[in-house]
Amino acid sequence: MINKIGVLTSGGDSPGMNAAIRSVVRAGLSEGLEIYGISDGYQGLYQDRMRKLDRYSVSDIINRGGTFLGSARFQEFREEAIRAIALNNMSKYGLGALVVIGGDGSYMGAKLLTEMGLPCIGLPGTIDNDVAGTDYTIGYFTALETVVEAIDRLRDTSTSHQRISIVEVMGRYCGDLTMAAAIAGGCEFIVLPEVEFQPEDLVYEIKASIAQGKKHAIVAITEYICNVFELALYIEKETGRETRATVLGHIQRGGNPVAYDRILASRMGAYSIELLLQGYRGRCVGVQNERLVHHDIADVIQNMKRPFRRDFLETARKLF
């Protein structure tokens, strides 16, 4: 029987992680469990940096961005000897299960620990919205608001100077954040990792819009597709229109979480406690059609593919 549970945040931070931690702690306490917070993700687990949390430990954090437990990337956790030390550290405190909040890399750590005998539940915490098994991840909607606000501001100056603006959005190899922000921000052009991209095709479309009288434009592009500063030089050379690139960077990860992320994180955190008490292990929580679901974490990592929102792309193309 599980009496004590650990909780950690791992990988890149996302707004709403604090709300998820708060939910895990308070839902666990309501079931008579003891909850321990682990600092700086799997690194803290390995370094034995854990502390007992009570309901006051998580007071006034639901509205705060980031993660008060801290987060880190710890590639060494792939090594079985490192994980064995982490498990031994957990046993010192009598921890019988672990809730992991993070992206697919964090899920991999939870999968490996489960295979070594520790029941783990994963919660999807990333602004990239690139985790399979869930419609939305914790932090995605807050990041979306941040990106749209940036696009709105870029539009003001692009209009004033009759300029082409390129805005690079996070997302790794998932275009959800870029696509949704482009629709909400009224971007004229969109470049996604899921769709083949040729710079000359983009230039052709920009020239066509200029020929139709368009004075300015905003191009939304997901990170890692190309060097956006080189792309800006190429567009300016080919079109004769001043072009500037803006990389939003880590500002997208910060800020107070919006209401939906707080609600989503709270629901998922409480659900993780339910699953552990019901005997589940090696599962990850998601929300699909607004209903909480859970999947085998190994299946999510290895087999499940996140569907591309082609309906969003079609909408975007009609409106641009």
Curated annotation (Swiss-Prot):
Instruction: Name its co-factor(s).
Output: Mg(2+)
Q: What is its EC number?
A: 2.7.1.11
Top-tier EC class: transferase
Indicate where this protein resides in the cell. Cytoplasm
The residues that hold Mg(2+) are 104
Alphabetized SUPFAM superfamilies for the sequence? Phosphofructokinase
Q: For binding substrate, which residues are annotated in this chain's numbering?
A: 126-128, 163, 170-172, 223, 244, 250-253
Keywords tagged on the record = Allosteric enzyme, ATP-binding, Cytoplasm, Glycolysis, Kinase, Magnesium, Metal-binding, Nucleotide-binding, Transferase
Residues annotated as binding ATP: 12, 73-74, 103-106
Q: What pathway annotation does it carry? A: Carbohydrate degradation; glycolysis; D-glyceraldehyde 3-phosphate and glycerone phosphate from D-glucose: step 3/4
Report one GO cellular component.
6-phosphofructokinase complex
Any one Gene Ontology biological process term? fructose 1,6-bisphosphate metabolic process
The residues annotated as the active site are: 128
Classification via InterPro entries: ATP_PFK, ATP_PFK_prok-type, PFKA_ATP_prok, Phosphofructokinase_CS, Phosphofructokinase_dom, PKF_sf
The residues the entry assigns to the signal sequence are none
- Give the catalytic activity: beta-D-fructose 6-phosphate + ATP = beta-D-fructose 1,6-bisphosphate + ADP + H(+)
The UniProt record gives the binding positions of ADP as: 22-26, 55-60, 155, 186-188, 214-216
Q: Which Pfam families match?
A: PFK (PF00365)
Subunit comment for this entry? Answer: Homotetramer.
Question: Which protein family is it in?
Answer: Belongs to the phosphofructokinase type A (PFKA) family. ATP-dependent PFK group I subfamily. Prokaryotic clade 'B1' sub-subfamily.
Full protein name: ATP-dependent 6-phosphofructokinase
- Identify the species of origin: Baumannia cicadellinicola subsp. Homalodisca coagulata
